[in-house]
């Protein structure tokens, strides 16, 4: 069955030793014989399993599914194989993160190692220790690449190798020496640290914490009253903090340094104690310098750029609002507008807001329209007189001069306002999944749709499809009349082109259409139809419209203009005018051959021809016409009734079949 034990052992030598050490660290001992048996079964039913092994939990779950399918088909799977498979799968679960791949280039000050502590509350345990375990991120993401498990063992379990005189130096509770950043050896797998929880078996023994300290320029000394750390974890060394200091830069470099405010530190301390470690964004705020620390006398006061963290409640509201109502719902637009105008958001903050609340496809749309808006704004800045010195890198927060938060904090107010307008505009163009943006020309008012609802839909579509504000306003005013229903058009028509300067055209249209479709409006229409009065400066006529002259009050056949034309044509063709009234209808001066009237002057219907012939008697239809029976001798006179019945009795009687012939015996 499968390959031999020696081949399996030589093929997976390094992987088997790594699995044994991994299980041993978890408190489970598995014999090499059982592991070889497991890999024999895997070789037989899972030929896709890589030769160098895998640490991806998804692959081991797939192995379990395929082994179950093999068991259902009648193959015998030993019980020890199931036990070993379950143990290995459970041992690999701590290596899986919420996102299977974490970029190691985002670590501040180091591209190799980043340790980020997290904690969670448990009802059964009052205190827990925090232990940072190394996670081989590229191995989990790409389990088929060549991996040296001996080097990986040195990275994952340094404290075991420390006892043997190898591995990196540990930073204990009483040591304050930070860990340096050395280049990776050739062939070593880059790793990133992911926080994992472990409940202490022996509470009397203090845990060992492996911490990464950021560079000195990103650190600050906490205030004396602040206490960092979690229950069951030793405090951080003096002068070090387990998270970097938000950069603080002055807009006036010549001003002397001011006292470092404690408000920012208090916010960070509070969020850290509450477990809010995922929302440390810092919108820029400009605060006036204290007296004596700003500019000299006679100079304008200086301000200092500081960061204040976003509340986690804002990010949660943004995420829930987008999920429940959509990114362009009235609630989300109002919330985003209040955040945008209530904070001095830099490009980094806009990217954080979009990433935390939008789906990947929606964020891609936002980023695309952001870049498109930046290109348009840069063209306007260059065409201005004088040109505005704001480039695309500054509006996007990229490049050598604007890629960091501290550099973006120094952006001028004009650049901040341009970024705000561009990002709000890009957010409005985000479409919900499965929806398409219709053309503004196809937005029409329904027969029973209120006029304000129609205008709101029209403005929303125009805002997404037309970038120029002036052009959008003209299109909305035009379509608000052209695409309205007939009732609203008749109400708006007296106002078209006559709205006073300074007044909003759409507002005047909405006022004119107020109440259309209601009971009061229907009653007014009925009253106007009966009395023909003029109400509200609007003439309501319900007569027919002439298709010849376009006037109201008569039809084309009664149009006086058409009759005059006919008379002129007749006089031209015949050379003479009709002498008198039509002899056929007696109500018009025209020739009888041209009379098209169906009724005369008295209202009597007229036939198609002037004279009709004698009506013909109805003809009898049938095979045998009925002839009256008259007995002989009474021709020309009425015979007696007895003679009539006697004659009828002498008529031959026929049935459907002839009478039967009865033979008479002699």
Curated annotation (Swiss-Prot):
Comp. bias (Pro residues): 232-247
Lipidation (N-myristoyl glycine): 2
Gene Ontology terms: cellular component: plasma membrane
Function comment: The products of the Gag polyproteins of infectious retroviruses perform highly complex orchestrated tasks during the assembly, budding, maturation, and infection stages of the viral replication cycle. During viral assembly, the proteins form membrane associations and self-associations that ultimately result in budding of an immature virion from the infected cell. Gag precursors also function during viral assembly to selectively bind and package two plus strands of genomic RNA. Endogenous Gag proteins may have kept, lost or modified their original function during evolution.
Note: This Gag protein is encoded by a human specific provirus.
Family the entry assigns: Belongs to the beta type-B retroviral Gag protein family. HERV class-II K(HML-2) gag subfamily.
The protein, known as: Endogenous retrovirus group K member 9 Gag polyprotein
């Amino acid at each position: 069955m499968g390959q031999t034990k020696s081949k399996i052992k030589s093929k997976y030598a390094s992987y088997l030793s790594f699995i044994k050490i991994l299980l041993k660290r978890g408190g489970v001992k598995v014999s090499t014989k059982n592991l070889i048996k497991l890999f024999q079964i895997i070789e037989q039913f899972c030929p896709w399993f890589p030769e160098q092994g895998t640490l991806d939990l998804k692959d081991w779950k797939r192995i379990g599914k395929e082994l179950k399918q093999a068991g259902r088909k009648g193959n015998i799977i030993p019980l020890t194989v199931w036990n070993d498979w379950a143990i290995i799968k459970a041992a690999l679960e701590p290596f899986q993160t919420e996102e299977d791949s974490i970029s190691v280039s985002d670590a501040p000050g180091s591209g190799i190692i980043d340790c980020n502590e997290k904690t969670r509350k448990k009802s059964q345990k009052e205190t827990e220790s925090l232990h940072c375990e190394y996670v081989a991120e590229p191995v989990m993401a790409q389990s088929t690449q060549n991996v040296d498990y001996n080097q990986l063992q040195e990275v994952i379990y340094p404290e075991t190798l420390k006892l043997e005189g190898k591995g990196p130096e540990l930073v204990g509770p009483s040591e304050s020496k930070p860990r340096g950043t050395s280049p990776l050896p050739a062939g070593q797998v880059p790793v990133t640290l992911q926080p994992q929880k472990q409940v202490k078996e022996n509470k009397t023994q203090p845990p060992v914490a492996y911490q990464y300290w950021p560079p000195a320029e990103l650190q600050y000394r906490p205030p004396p009253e602040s206490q960092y750390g979690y229950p069951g974890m030793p405090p951080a060394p003096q002068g070090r903090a387990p998270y970097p200091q938000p950069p603080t830069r002055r807009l006036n470099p010549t001003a002397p340094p001011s006292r470092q405010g404690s408000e920012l530190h208090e916010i960070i301390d509070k969020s850290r104690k509450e477990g809010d470690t995922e929302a440390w964004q810092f919108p820029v705020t400009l605060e006036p310098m204290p007296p004596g620390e700003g500019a000299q006398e006679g100079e304008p006061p200086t301000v200092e750029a500081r960061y204040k963290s976003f509340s986690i409640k804002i990010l949660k509201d943004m995420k829930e609002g987008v999920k429940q109502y959509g990114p362009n719902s009235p609630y989300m637009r109002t919330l985003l507008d209040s955040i945008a105008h209530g904070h001095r958001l830099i490009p980094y903050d806009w990217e954080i807001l979009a990433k935390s609340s939008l789906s990947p496809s929606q964020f891609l749309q936002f980023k695309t329209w952001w870049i498109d808006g930046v290109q348009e704004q840069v063209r306007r800045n260059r065409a201005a007189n004088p040109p505005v010195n704001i480039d695309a890198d500054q509006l996007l927060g990229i490049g050598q001069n604007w890629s960091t938060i501290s550099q973006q904090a120094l952006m001028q107010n004009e650049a901040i306002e341009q970024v705000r307008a561009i990002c709000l505009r890009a957010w409005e163009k985000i479409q919900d999944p499965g929806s398409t943006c219709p053309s503004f020309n196809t937005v029409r008012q329904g027969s029973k749709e209120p006029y304000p609802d129609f205008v709101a839909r029209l403005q929303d579509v125009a805002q997404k499809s037309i970038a120029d504000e002036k052009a959008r306003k003209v299109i909305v005013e035009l379509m608000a009349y052209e695409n309205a229903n007939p009732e609203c058009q008749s109400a708006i028509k007296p106002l078209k082109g006559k709205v006073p300067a300074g007044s909003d055209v759409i507002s005047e249209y909405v006022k004119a259409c107020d109440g259309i479709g209601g009971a009061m409006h229907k009653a007014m229409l009925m009253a106007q139809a009966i009395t023909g009065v003029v109400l509200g400066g609007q003439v309501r006529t319900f007569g027919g419209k002439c298709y010849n002259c376009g006037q109201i009050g008569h039809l084309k056949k009664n149009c006086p203009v058409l009759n005059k034309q006919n008379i002129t044509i007749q006089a031209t063709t015949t050379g003479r005018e009709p002498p008198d009234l039509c002899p056929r209808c007696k109500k018009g001066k025209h020739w009888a051959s041209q009379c098209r009237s169906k009724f005369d002057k008295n209202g009597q219907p007229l036939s198609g021809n002037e004279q009709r012939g004698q009506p013909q008697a109805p003809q009898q239809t049938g095979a045998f016409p009925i002839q009256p029976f008259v007995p002989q001798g009474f021709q020309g006179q009425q015979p007696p009734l007895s003679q009539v019945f006697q004659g009828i009795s002498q008529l031959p009687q026929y049935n459907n079949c002839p009478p039967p012939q009865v033979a008479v015996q002699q």
